[in-house]
Amino acid sequence: MKEELMTEVMQHMLSYLDNAQMKQLRQVMEQALCRYDVTELEMKPEEDDSNNLIARFIAAKRIEGCSEKTLKYYQTTIDALVVSIGKSVRHIHTEDLRTYLTEYQSKKQSSRVTIDNIRRILSSFFSWLEDEDYIIKSPVRRIHKVKAASNIKETFSDEDLEKMRDNSENLRDLAMIDMLASTGMRVGEMVLLNRDDINFAERECVVFGKGEKERIVYFDARAKLHLQEYLDSRTDDNPALFVTLRTPHERIKIGGIEYRLRKMGKQLNIPKVHPHKFRRTLATMAIDKGMPIEQLQRLLGHQRIDTTLQYAMVKQSNVKMAHKKYIG
């Protein structure tokens, strides 16, 4: 067994050492190994080992409170890496990851934001492997954050919002638009709301955000009136706040809301109408009117204030006015 081990090592070093150095290497190995018994260990198949470690990581993240949607994204991202590289996660190196990310971006024409999202997931996974002593050092440490272009994302104008309200085909759609526009809640939070969750007296409701974190959101008087009109018009007994228009009137899904908004946007010639744009619009409006960023962070349910800053785009006209006020 010792001879086989030395032969394997020397074969790997052939392209790096000359004959004299190879001879010296053999002598050193013979002296070093003479005091030891060498036996071959039966190794686990690398694929099974990787799958096992990925499953443990996902379980750890589930305990930490990550949503099933996030866990699925983690799983598919890491699985894709392992399949592409063809190595056990224990043996993946920094250069493997750099090559993978470069090829992924080239093949799929992915944005820098997408590539950095993948990098962050891999960083979380390999850092966990390091913390749990499955590997010595995370190979992602030397792969830095991918710099993305800072594009100003569009928000709805006041005219856009009024157009959508005036052209809503039914009371439900009108109430949904007002709730999204005045609360800034995520569409995934809105579809989970029940009738009993709404406090009309205080114009507020409790939603469960990412990681099942509970917070209060608030709606304006217009949203209150339109929501009451919608609920009064319903003939079903489904506890869900928003339901499908057709019987049996089941709880509406995220895809259903996205479809209705997309259809309305095309009809009214309003670009990129989707639920998240309402959230960004509210954040920008709040900042423009002077809401402290810490309060906006709480309203939107962001864990990190950096995320809130990415949502809120200050209008250029306000920047110009501030320049005149403070600088001259």
Describe the function of each predicted region.
Residues 34-44, 51, 55-152:
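N-terminal core-binding DNA-recognition domain of tyrosine recombinases/integrases
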Residues 180-202:
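Short, charged phosphate-coordinating catalytic segments
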Residues 209-229, 240-260:
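C-terminal catalytic core of Y-nucleophile DNA break-rejoin enzymes
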Residues 178, 182, 279-302:
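C-terminal catalytic core of tyrosine-transesterase DNA break-rejoin enzymes
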